Amino acid sequence: MSCLFNSYDPYFKQPFGAVRAGQSVHLTLCIPEELGYVDPHLVLQKEGKYDVPVHYRMKFDGQTPHQNHFSVDVVLGDPGLYFYYFDLYTDFRRIVRGADNCGVVSWQEGESWQITVYEPDFQTPECIKGKVFYQIFPDRFCEGIENKPMPFPDRLYQADKHAEPFWQPNETGGHLNEDYFGGDLEGIRIKLPYLREMGVDYLYLNPSFDAHSNHRYNTADYLNVDPLLGTNEEFEVLCREAAKYGIGIVLDGVFSHTGSDSRYFNREGRYGEGGAYRDPNSPYRSWYDFDPKYKGGYRSWWGFETLPEVNEETPSFVEFITGEGGVIDTWLRRGAAGFRLDVADELPDEFIEKIRTAVKRVSPEKFLLGEVWEDATTKFGFDHRRTYLLGKGLDSVMNYPFKNSVLDFVKGKPAQQAANEILSICEHYPAPAINTALNFLSTHDTERALTVIADEPANGRGREWQSGRSVTGEAYEEGMLRLRMAYAIIYTLPGVPCLYYGDEIGMQGYRDPFNRAFFCWDSHEERLRPVLAQLAQLRHSCEAFRTGELRVLRAEDGILHYQRIGKTETAEIIVNRSEHIIVEPLASGKHTEVNPMGFTIVVEENGHNPNHSYYDIQ
């Protein structure tokens, strides 16, 4: 039986994907004659406590050999998630979503399709679209000022930049992340030419505020740069110098918790006798929940006593973060291009909306990104479906689903499965959000891409097993080829690619802290960097990579062939995971060869007489 319905196919659903509130959606069914008489209805339900299914009768559109065609138009008025299937109104049959997104006939309830409806005025920064990001873990990138004195005696300086980060428990059995390699803001400034040569447009910096750990997710002072990284003035200099290279700086905002060792909480007493922990009358006391039922006597992030959670609805905290002259306002006016919100799905929607207001008050072109590990439109939290991607909260999110699908594909996952997973995210996310989603293969929270591709899975084994591991020889060589393929996909999918520092030279490492080693500046691995530079140049020059629609032409036998369809240009990308050369037909009717474990990109001007530009990057 042929496909009855597929929301990824423009014949069956127009427009593709999410829609603005008030926009009309056209749906078409293709019913084989063998199903007999049917009277199909669209059954549509908005998700909500008081919402009920609404039935829309579909009109007969005509016949093709052995098939009857029916369609319906529906206007979706309010932002939210809508779910739908089709009732055939005969013999209790319905058409529900099958495993490959195609409609299948069922006599019982099944999976529905989703339509995301977002705010009609939702816009995201145009300056982000079509660009390239680069993530830096500040302590581990580059030491611009050498032999700096440690600002606090409990910080341990690591002079050997090739050393493995500390991973063994200290004398108390804990991991305090007290080893510092000395990376700083001046080191980032020095490397701006290197970054621009790779086509980098934005730097996403892991936390840079004053904090007493090398990762700095335990904020001690929201309004000052960590002294080992530099000063507030040096941050402003970095922003100005980066702007000369066309590079913006996006900061990491950690607002779900502070450090216990902070001027706000001050459990350790570093900041005198003040702070919420030591002083019941502290102005910060209301930021935290103190109760003997909690470990340590206060609520903490996932039970880590060094990370006391804040009440994000406390007026004084909200004002401190989002008010005029507050944390967001201060850093954007110092030169930052935006914020990435740590654990965004653990922040209340109302708080995120106030952060958005603070960001856009400075400029609509300032960027607000959220850390969400799953499909951000379907996340539950605080006893309800999260709404932060519908136009009043985040601009976009970190695209972990793409990362997982791309890495699994280059390792051997069926191409069709990877394509369906990617299309699902593209379908669910509002266009302004998918066009600014941060696409990556490695982060400070995940294993490095080359390790995932080429090394043995950790499978829950601990740090002792992970320590010192790396692949060499044939496994490394093949891994680099597969990594090259993976980045070709990441650079050409909807969204903006983000390169994690060191991936370009084949750095390896399992999870924290092994994925956070110091950048190996004396590495001789130079094969991937020019490829990334060419991919970045292509993104900058081809408008299809800014907002072009994704359309998959073929996904089988290790071949992933897709288009990005822009207003004036169409880019066609063919990725060949197989071990032999393929000859692939293009949408234009011509053919192109694609090397084993390689890729080819063809850019055409839209129109009757397109100009062809072939990019087979070696």
Language-model segments: residues:
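C-terminal beta-strand-rich structural cap/linker in extracellular carbohydrate-active enzymes
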Residues: 31-33, 592-618
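Aromatic/acidic polysaccharide-binding cleft in carbohydrate-active enzymes
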Residues: 139, 382-383, 435-471, 487-525
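Beta-strand-rich binding/interaction modules
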Residues: 29, 36-48, 53-54, 82-84, ...
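The feature marks proteins involved in alpha-glucan
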Residues: 1-24, 50-135, 141-161, 168
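Carbohydrate-binding surface patches
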Residues: 14-16, 26, 553-586
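Active-site-proximal helices and loops of the catalytic beta/alpha 8
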Residues: 239-248, 256-257, 262-273, 327, ...
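Conserved, mostly hydrophobic/aromatic
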Residues: 29, 136, 195, 205, ...
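Substrate-binding/active-site clefts of carbohydrate-active enzymes
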Residues: 137-202, 208-334, 355-361
